[in-house]
Amino acid sequence: QVTDYLSALCQELADMGFDEILLDNAGYPYDGQVGVLATSENRPEDRTVPVSAFYARLAGELEAKGVCLSVCAYEDLAPGDEVYSGMTAGVLAQNVGRVWLDAGVSREHYEAILATGGFDNPAARIVSPAGAAGEGSWYR
């Protein structure tokens, strides 16, 4: 139900004329005491599968409308294959147009991580805070 709602919301934004949709924290919870959450039967062993399926669904629907699906990523989300969030470099490479970085993330380090995950031309598809935010922008 949640993915259906988010899909409908993203499509509505695309119909309003937005050319890029940026998702933030669009994976399984990864910060704090997530071990408590990991005991539920609803939490799959390999969280990359549902996260990748969710991104692929949105990316396909948005691409048909000429809209780029982007994701905000943090340093600890993509370096490995075993992450709590399910959002790895490989998942991002397969499904998103651009990756927006948190202010504390090294752009060069992240370019290498994403290239290893199969991200084509990561330098052109990464947005970092340095020089990206215009006057009055929320992105810093």
Features from the language model and the residues they span:
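Substrate-binding cleft of secreted/luminal carbohydrate-active enzymes
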Residues: 90, 95-140
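Extracytoplasmic/secreted cell-surface and envelope-processing proteins
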Residues: 30-33, 78-82, 108-112
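Aromatic-lined carbohydrate-recognition surfaces of secreted/lumenal glycan-active proteins
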Residues: 22-24, 45-85, 100, 122-131
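Active-site-adjacent "subsite" loops/lids of carbohydrate-active enzymes
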Residues: 1-11
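Generic structural signal for well-ordered alpha-helices
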Residues: 10-11, 51-59, 89, 111-115
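Active-site-proximal loop/short-helix segments
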Residues: 19-48
